[in-house]
Structures are given as C-alpha cells and as structure tokens.
Amino acid sequence: MKTLLLTLVVVTIVCLDLGYTRKCHNSPLSLVYQTCPIGQNICFKINVKEAPSIPVKRACAATCPKSSALVKVVCCKTDKCN
C-alpha cells in the first residue's frame, strides 16, 4: 500500500509542472513561443499604432512595458495570449 501511494505521489509530481512558467509567443508570427524565465509571468505584444494588426514584438516580461505615442502595448497573463 505504501508503494502504491509513493508511486501515485511521484506520478503526480512528474505530471504537474510544479515550477510552472508562462509560455509566450516570441516572434511576430504566432507560431513560435518560448517558455519564459522565472519571474517573467507576463506576455506582451507591441504594435505600431499606424498598423495595429501587425505585431512588431512579442515576448515575456516581469512588468508590462509602457505604451507610447507610436506604439501600443498589450499585456496578458495566460499562456500564448500575446
């Protein structure tokens, strides 16, 4: 019985990502993504305001970058949301 319990605990640990990290797209195309470094739990996408449908940059961040007069930044906190 102890062996079965230990086996279940090990399987649970292996199946769960205990050190969960965010996954964010990291290219203008949404086909490629990266696992973010520890501490960077925000995905962001930067678009030029004149061409909002074309992302300029997608990446991970610890804090959301600021938008400016020329670029719009969209931040989110779920996997591949950017």
Curated annotation (Swiss-Prot):
Pfam families: Toxin_cobra-type. GO terms for molecular function: toxin activity. Residues 1-21 form the signal peptide. It is found in: Secreted; Target cell membrane. One of its GO terms (cellular component) is extracellular region. Keywords: Disulfide bond, Membrane, Secreted, Signal, Target cell membrane, Target membrane, Toxin. The keyword Transcription does not apply. Expressed by the venom gland. Disulfide bonds join C24-C43, C36-C60, C64-C75, C76-C81. The keyword Secreted applies. Belongs to the three-finger toxin family. Short-chain subfamily. Orphan group XV sub-subfamily. Has low cytotoxic activity. This is Cytotoxin homolog Clbp-3. It comes from Naja atra.
